[in-house]
Amino acid sequence: MAATGVHTSEGRQTGRLASRAETAQRVLLLCGLMSSLLYVGTDALGAIRYPGYSYTSQAISELGAIGSPVAALLMPLFLTYDVLLIAFGVGVLRAAVDRNRALRVAGALLTAIGVIGLFWLPFFPMHARGAGTTLTDTMHIVLSAVTVLLILLAIGFGARAFGKGFRRYSIATILILVAAGALAGRDGARLAAQLPTPWLGVTERINVFGYLLWVAVLAVLLLRSRSHRADA
């Protein structure tokens, strides 16, 4: 009787620990969806609060640039986005334990993107248009290029996490990001030369929002996968 009671108590404790671990994992994965929504909302808020800002012709980075009237408002929100992305990356790493190596690599890359973001905007913001170029602008461009590369790699590795449908969607996302990124890069050179960039805001947002959508879709699929496993 006593032994049976001990085993029952241990079983309950193990069940509670497993339940807490599952809840924590779901929260981490939910951070992926929340991070994408927060970034889009922060971008929209900044564009609304920035007098004279053009959503079609100005870059997202200009919202947090040195001299931007909304930089102080947006900084905590962008940093929160990075923290959420890091949490999601950890969640992907944990979810990949019973999946495949490619998903583990994707989780590590997403975590790295979030870590870079924590240093990118606070320490290496660009200057507002017409203010000239300094070391921070150069580092901003370098970190931007590194982040884009990590994003493409994360999507490429993450494409193998689910079936053919998600793989095709991921490949299409990469193609769109490369095309939009090339156009944004061309306008970036014009921005550095103090020339007009009538479509920079559009092409850059296609690039960024395409990636954010992919992160959100991955988060939803991973959450659904866990729900189906729990119901089985």
Task: Give the ranges of each region predicted by the language model.
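Short, Lys/Arg-rich, polar N-terminal cytosolic tail immediately upstream
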Residues: M1-A24
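Short, charged juxtamembrane terminal tails flanking transmembrane helices
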Residues: A2-T8, R224-A232
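Hydrophobic, aromatic-enriched alpha-helical segments typical of multi-pass transmembrane helices
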Residues: L17-Y53, A59-L63, G67-S225
